[in-house]
Amino acid sequence: MSELAQRQLTELAEISDGAIQLLGTVTESGLTTLTVSLDTSGIETANGGIRLRARERFEIIVGPSFPDLHPDVNVAHRRWAGTPHVQWGRHLCLYAAPSVEWNPADGMRGLIARLNLWLQRAAAGELDPAGRPLHPPVAYHSYKHGWVVVRPDLGDLVPWTNAGPERVKLLYAWCAKRGKRIDVLEWLTRQQIIDRLVADDLRAQGENGVAYFAAPLVLISDTLEMEYPTTAALLAGALDTYGLNRDELLRVLVNARIINKAIGVTLEGDDAVPAMMLLGTPARRLEPGVLLAHITAWHLDDLGADITDLLQEVSPEHVELAARVRKLAHDWLGFARLQWMVIHEARPEVTRRRDAGSPLQWLAGKRVLVLGCGALGAPIAEQCIRAGVAQLHVIDKGAVTPGILLRQPYEDADIGYNKAERLATRLSRIRHDLTVTSSSANIVTGTLTDPADLLQYDLIVDATADIGVRVGIERARGAIRAEWPATISALFGHTAQRGVATISLPGATGSGHDILRRLSIDTAITAPAGWKDLADDLFPNPPRTERFFPEPGCSAPTFTGSAAETAALASALLVSAVSVLASTDAEPMTAIGCDLSPEVRGPRPVRLGWRNDVILPDKTGNYEVRINARALAELRTETRRGRRVRGGRIETGGMLL
């Protein structure tokens, strides 16, 4: 579609009064290059931005997929090399997110407008404003060389946080290798490495074939160009200007090999750890005045690894041989191309959680117990993991059966195995820092018989939809309700389109069983707004006689609903319930109703709350009498009125409690 692009650009030039000039067109290898000249005389430079001449020339490269894909824009000079969003010194990065920012309907008019906006911002030095996600210096990497997940913050370890003379600093990344993937687990100084070696505290192998090794991290206090060097010679030259000469660079690589050899890491063969180095430079933001480290990594080619091994093994006593090996190493730096590795940032200091502002952030750092690992409990447990809980324990005595696979997150290989065990195994793979624990105990006769053991949790989620479990929780928490964790009990309606979650805070009079009783009473005659359909589904009157039995024999009746419906409803109930926990004005007892049916009208979710009751202990200790505070006040008022009107000897009908 280069003809379309050329025609649009020609029409723009004709009506631009000379501001846009089409100078030439060249088509080669399926790409059309349109050379244009733009009037940029009105764009002023400020804040160290790029300098523009009265007119600037650009090469617009149009592919066969135009206008579905945006054209690329290059310049013929390198005057703007080193500027943010200028790659390879000539390529202008106009779109941070083309799928959002490029509109095919705008065509060349939209491209020229975007280019003009880019030039204005580049001249004003505003291409990387504070608070925007970082566009780092560009290192052209490939997954074939491996990828690195960086997890620990560097914080004050960087040399540019103090006013001292130190411009270069060497640290070591303690890494775990799984295939081509490398995880940086922590940063260590050289002395810490030595101390751990002496203490035999550095292991070379872990579980499931994980290999551990050390890789050097060189931190320099000045930013490199926006494109990182493509050859070892250019990188070595850049590092030399910042205080790390070629001999020191080679020494860094050699020392890393010596350390890994001492640890016992495999350095040769298919299972060898990579000879690699990480480079850290100051990023240009995140907040004003704060310079965080931007990290890249490069992998030595096989010859480079062999040379560093030679440098390690040659004896200083063999002066001539050592000099020849050193010359060989310098020669290698001169011709070796850098193999940049892909970096995946997971450092909290430079990344932002994608769930920022979500109610589920309340779960971060919490210890959570999930009872039941079915269509309700399994999705909730997974949401807890992704929300950042510090501990998760799941309990279910049931086994995975073929019929549940259509709506519960298990697979064919899980059939016959315990649900909780299989769920915990899968969820433990989501995060590197958390192992989910499980139990197949009977919740009523096992878990709830030791209530004190449950006080370690911040939240208990009852996803069993089992009345026996709900009653068991009421009894277990009765004597220690002030210390009992916040508890969510949830259940689905008969078609998994409606559901209710109850929330009881620490110290609440009742939990799920009691709150559902209150809810059924309060919605029985005149249901509050939004509750009628929910009440008819969950508390049918008369009770529903037709039940769904999925398997022959004595299988338990259940609801109907697909995986999409159960996952959506479970997530909606969890978000709504946690919103109550995160609020500051929640009643001690709350019920949340979620109606996801297509025909629903009115507010959703809907919410009812109750204050604590007055609790009167039974003399036998077997019962607990709970009286609504308002009802108790009315009873007292009536008994006092009766005494006053009828006298103290009149039978009150049991109202004098």
Residues of each region from the PLM?
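Compact alpha/beta protein-protein interaction domains typified by the UBC
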Residues: 24-109, 113, 158-159
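Glycine/serine-rich phosphate-binding loop and adjoining beta1-alpha1 elements at the start
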Residues: 149-366
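Glycine-rich adenosine-cofactor-binding loop
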Residues: 356-401
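Glycine-rich phosphate-binding loop and adjoining beta1-alpha1-beta2 segment
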Residues: 397-433
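A structured beta-alpha segment of the ubiquitous adenosine-cofactor-binding alpha/beta core
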Residues: 424-458, 464-466
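ADP-ribose/adenylate-binding Rossmann-like module
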Residues: 459-503
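Adenosine-phosphate binding glycine-rich loop
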Residues: 486-599
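N-terminal beta-strand/alpha-helix entry module and adjacent surface
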Residues: 599-657
